[in-house]
Amino acid sequence: MERALCEVARGGPHHLLSVRWPSGDLREMRARAVVEVARKVAEHKSLPRGLVQAALHGGRQASHAWEQAVANVPAGAAELAQALEASQATGKPASIIAFSLGCRVVLYAIAAGVIAPGSVERLVFAASAAPASDFEVLPGMLEGGTSVVHVFSKKDAVLDRLYPLGERKTRPSGRRALEIPGVENVEVDVGHRGYASIAARLWDLAVAPGEG
């Protein structure tokens, strides 16, 4: 995702910060789960038994990976603060594109005051793995003049299948529109991995209001 965004942003008049938190990438969790299923099936030489064992082990593994990712969010916000400070030296207007669990990092940074209202021109949240309630920090940013875009897809099966069981009551916002006045909702027709294929569109949303 970062590579695709860097390609479309290279040499532009805008400074783009892309935020993805790799310690808990949902697609990587899914890949590990697939490997675990294959290993357990081979170990037990039985598809039904292997699937049961893989489900038990995979559930614990995914839960641990998620907890680790969430625990690392403050560290991600600190890194983002440094990147924002460095971006000021470029003299270019800055925007942030947050992807998947990276949305939690940006929302945490806003709540902590790391991203002040008006300090960035636009915030684009794509394939958000954060619940809608986390976005309650946005009104202050909107009032400060920062534009906010929420990009979602009803076809994002990764968000639907891998969101932690303990958070089923608060579904990830990346599957539906965000109901916050002033937030621009954009629906796309891609899965979680497919967001890299629309990097140019995400870039347009980050720098050209009304033209995405």
Q: Where would I find each of the regions flagged by the language model?
A:
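Lipolytic serine-hydrolase domain surface
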Residues: 1-78, 85-87, 92, 112-122, ...
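Aromatic pocket-lining residues of Rossmann-like dinucleotide-binding sites
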Residues: 109
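Gly/Ala-rich beta-loop-alpha elbow adjacent to hydrolase catalytic centers
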Residues: 96-102, 106
